[in-house]
Amino acid sequence: MKVTVENKKGLNKDIKVFIDKETMNSYMDEKYEEIKKTVNLKGFRPGKVPKEVLKRQFGQAIFSEVLDKVLKDTSVKALEDNKIKPAGQPKLDLKTYGEDKDLEYVMSITELPKVELKSVENIKFDEYSVKIDTNETDKRIKEIAKSQNNFKEVAADVRAVEENLVIFDYKATIDGKDFTGGEGKNTQLILGKDLFIKGFDKQLIGVKKNDEKSVDVTLPENYPQKEYANKKANFICKITEVKKSEEVKIDDVFAKNLGAKDLADLKVLVSKQINDEYKNSLDKLAKTQILKEIENFKVDEIPENLIEEEVKILSQGMTEEDSKKSRKNFEEIAKKRIKVGLILNEFGEQNKIKVTEQEVQAEVQKQLRMMPGQEKMVMEFYQKNPSALASLRGTVYEEKIIDLIKTKAKPSKKEISKEEAEKILKEHQKQDHNHEHDHNHDHDHPEEKKASKSTKIEKKPKPSASKKPSTKKVSKK
């Protein structure tokens, strides 16, 4: 194989590859020998079909298969031997090819630019620890206790008030006619939360057991059966039970039920949990600071093809007119994203950072925990969307790079109060929409839902740099 590299304008190169016909014929002979072992042709014993017969029967198909393999193998080798990293898929132009002929082709590529890695020890970022006072811990424990309240049935003549649990059967009609989904049994509502159809539960205030109550509402715009959306409906509700919540006593027994040794231990765990909530959000802010610092590193030139691909991603879902108006802004965002991505990749390669299959699966499991009850849907999504799984792998890779940078850099360590943390995060949230740092472009994730109350201890979400912290179980480290 002969390879000639011709430099074009900027990062563009033409790589000419020549393979003589003797080498091509040896590839063909290997393939014929491979096929001869398995092919069955009338009049010939298995493994004894002559090459000329195979050539007449399968020659064109075999050559196409061999050509694909040779192009793949030789193009990769040509790039590796010349230490060329392409930005995107190379374009192949076949000049000469065919059975019993030389193979000659030109591979046109845009090369990844040279990246100058500064010493990461110079990167500056803030590392916060949040001091949580006892009042905040006690407040959170009370909220947890409230979420654990038990409901006990009240006397048949007691009328329902806000925060009571009402259980009922219903039959609904639109313009006096039954409709799909208009019937329910043992429906449960906590009055005052307005979690069913808007304005529904307040009409049940004052009902008692065995009452029949008529409720008029307008079905929501996102009603599952679209033909009924925004229509007025009448619900005839048969009240089967009214229950009142009983406060849970906050003591050692309560703490043990939540997995703690005693109440004192629970306070330690909850305090740590609150601190972790803020830490997770503040860590995202630190990541943003690091990425902003990396923007100051030098990259000779940004490949135009990568900019174009990134602009297409940013323009997804927009009209052609809006896309044109935003073009200049999108190009600037694209250049920043690509530049930082190139630098992170170079840092990752130099430090031999790898992502294992176990780490990818751990990230998938993290996604599953965020969407309880929809685990099957999430798994199927990743199985059917390899690009989404690749994006997830990219997320893990970037996080490992950022974590390593944090260990090498010298952070400015600061202890702050909860109020100061909220102020910092709020300020960052205001600026967040102006700073794009999502280098993995995770456009393929399934729609996320908030975690349900399936864990023993529920967190109260706090403000964060980009979104509220997720619900997690309190655990000891």
From Swiss-Prot:
Pfam entry (one): Trigger_C
Ranges where the record places region Disordered: 408-477
Biological process terms in GO annotation: 'de novo' cotranslational protein folding; cell division; chaperone-mediated protein folding; protein transport; protein unfolding
EC number(s) from the headed UniProt entry: 5.2.1.8
Ubl conjugation listed as a keyword: no
Family annotation (InterPro entries): PPIase_dom_sf, PPIase_FKBP_dom, Trig_fac, Trigger_fac_C, Trigger_fac_C_sf, Trigger_fac_ribosome-bd_bac, Trigger_fac_ribosome-bd_sf, Trigger_fact/SurA_dom_sf
Chain segments annotated as coiled-coil in the UniProt record: none
GO cellular component, one term: cytoplasm
Protein's UniProt keywords contain Disulfide bond: no
Family membership: Belongs to the FKBP-type PPIase family. Tig subfamily.
Protein name from the UniProt record: Trigger factor
Origin species: Pelagibacter ubique (strain HTCC1062)
Gene name for this UniProt entry: tig
